[in-house]
């Protein structure tokens, strides 16, 4: 069972601040080892995770499974868009949704990434993830992204 955490309405200066926040939050939740926050920052620097979709940009930061204690996903919707470097070039994209992945094994990570990429190609799902009230976000993400077989 994957832990799912959601948070909206936080302002960040830049992606470094976002990644630091994610690292601190996941440490506080007890789902990562103390090596995870720095590993997340290092991996994002080497392998950027910003993705421009049809209507919105997102980022899916993650790092090696060795740094995880248990599986989790952290959905973070910053107050203002935050620039992340795109995964496929040197340009930045203004991200309105961050989906941080904490996984315990590489096969699980690959499966989860494939699932996410498939669902995030649907503009209506992305729009809903960005605009839905925070109180409904966990249920929606679980039902329409994680548990959906479509």
From Swiss-Prot:
- Which source organism? Escherichia coli (strain K12)
Q: What is its main location?
A: cytoplasm
GO CC entries: cytosol; transmembrane transporter complex
State the protein's name: PTS system galactitol-specific EIIA component
Name the UniProt key words of this record, in alphabetical order.
Answer: Cytoplasm, Galactitol metabolism, Kinase, Phosphoprotein, Phosphotransferase system, Sugar transport, Transferase, Transport
Would the keyword Phosphoprotein be found if you checked this record's keyword annotation? yes
What does the entry's free-text domain comment contain? The EIIA domain is phosphorylated by phospho-HPr on a histidyl residue. Then, it transfers the phosphoryl group to the EIIB domain.
Upregulating conditions: Constitutively expressed.
| Residues in PTS EIIA type-2 domain copies | 1-144
């Amino acid at each position: 069972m994957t832990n799912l955490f959601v948070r909206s309405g936080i302002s960040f200066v830049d992606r470094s601040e976002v990644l630091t926040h994610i690292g601190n939050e996941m440490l506080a939740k007890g789902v990562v080892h103390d090596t995870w926050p720095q590993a997340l920052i290092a991996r994002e620097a080497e392998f950027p995770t910003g993705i421009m979709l049809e209507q919105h940009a997102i980022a899916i930061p993650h790092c090696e499974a060795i740094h995880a204690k248990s599986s989790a996903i952290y959905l973070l919707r910053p107050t203002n868009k935050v620039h992340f470097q795109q995964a496929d070039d040197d340009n930045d994209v203004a991200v309105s949704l961050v989906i941080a992945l904490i996984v315990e094994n590489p096969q699980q990570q690959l499966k989860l990434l494939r699932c996410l990429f498939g669902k995030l190609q649907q503009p209506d799902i992305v729009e809903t993830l960005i605009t839905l009230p925070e109180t409904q976000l966990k249920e929606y993400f679980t039902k329409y992204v994680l548990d959906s077989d479509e």
